[in-house]
Regions:
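Secondary-structure boundary/capping micro-motif
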Residues: 1-256, 261-345
Length: 345
């Protein structure tokens, strides 16, 4: 039996098991595979919204994105689909109508010889990674998923009798866990999710970039006077995927955009890599010099505050500029909507 046949045969068994009749999406299951460093974590979808499927988090780092997604959904609405995508880092298996699945997926299913029929019954795999366009799984993923699904079918079946565990109030966040040994035997227990993972992605310990500029550059910009204005600043993904020059998986480029609220003018719009702190710092001081003055305050979207602060906090503190998180950037929100419409056209 080749990998595709084995994969879709297991997928059909998962579909027929109807786990979403009993599991809520926050009833996370943990499975420790013998040759896997971290446990694999699975969320079962469908009981609440009738969108049937599974989210497979390959390790603890990916699980932190699950909690980040929950946190952001609870405390603020996602402004766009691209913003929501940045909280996804996992493999999803969703069951869709036949007419809604991509042609490539249909060809794989057809070639496997495994039959699927009915509404919301056709499997679609998607690999999610922040900054990248949702993509098809690769052959390495197929082998991994076969190993997971073989264990998930029996584990989720057995744990059905223990789901009342998730209804109890817990001092720590625990999930049902099955640990497999190389000989196929297993032990059932509970897994305490580390506090750092529960905090999500953005609240994990952040390394603030040092000032990457020369003393001459800093002296020059420090001599600028404070202006009576506030800047809005954002570094966010643009929802139009771009294929890298060397090919491969399409990416969502990041755009640094700055607006001066005093005259309602966009003063910077430049594509950047969020990890290139030196480039971002240099753009800011060039803006200050071009505007002949420093803003006493720069406001940023609260959801991206940590990411932006990691690049700019030390620089702005030295320049006596306050970096302030806010729930919404009034001027840039409108500007970004107009830009998205432009890209769509």
């Amino acid at each position: 039996m080749n990998n595709q046949v084995q994969l879709y045969s297991l997928v059909k068994k998962l579909y027929q098991a109807n786990f979403w009749e009993d599991y809520w999406d926050n009833d996370i299951i943990g499975i420790q595979l013998p040759d896997h460093k971290d446990p694999v974590f699975i969320s079962i979808l469908g009981k609440a919204e009738q969108n049937f499927g599974f989210l497979i988090y390959r390790n603890l780092e990916e699980l932190s994105y699950y909690f980040e997604m929950r946190k952001q959904a609870e405390f603020s609405e996602f402004n766009s689909a691209i913003e929501m995508l940045q909280t996804h880092k996992c493999i999803s298996l969703n069951f869709e109508d036949r007419k809604e699945i991509p042609k490539e997926e249909y060809e794989k299913i057809k070639a496997s010889g495994v039959t699927f029929r009915g509404k919301k019954a056709w499997p679609v795999f998607t690999d999610y990674k922040p900054g990248y366009y949702p993509f098809a799984i690769n052959e390495k993923d197929v082998s991994f998923l076969i190993a997971v699904f073989e264990k998930l079918i029996e584990t989720a079946t057995d744990f059905r009798a223990s789901l009342q565990f998730y209804e109890k109030e817990q001092e720590t966040y625990e999930i049902l866990m099955r640990t497999y040994k190389r000989d196929g035997s297993y032990e059932d227990g509970f897994y305490v999710v580390p506090e750092a993972i529960l905090e999500g992605v953005l609240d994990n310990e952040v390394e603030y970039a040092s000032i990457k500029l020369t003393d001459f550059e800093m002296k020059r910009v420090n001599n600028q006077k404070m202006k009576h204005t506030i800047w809005e600043l954002d570094i966010d993904f643009i929802g139009v995927p771009v294929v890298p020059p060397n090919g491969g998986r399409p990416i969502f480029p990041s755009l640094l955009i700055v607006a001066d609220t005093k005259n309602s003018e966009v003063i910077c719009s430049e594509f950047v890599n969020p990890i290139e702190a030196e480039k971002i710092q240099r753009i800011i001081i060039q803006l200050i010099l071009a505007q002949n003055g420093k803003p006493p305050k720069i406001v940023v979207n609260a959801n991206r505050y940590v990411k932006i602060a990691s690049c700019l906090e030390n620089l702005l503190t030295t320049l006596d500029i306050e970096l302030v998180p806010v729930q919404k950037l009034p001027l840039l929100s409108v500007v970004k909507e107009d830009m998205l419409e432009y890209f769509k056209d």
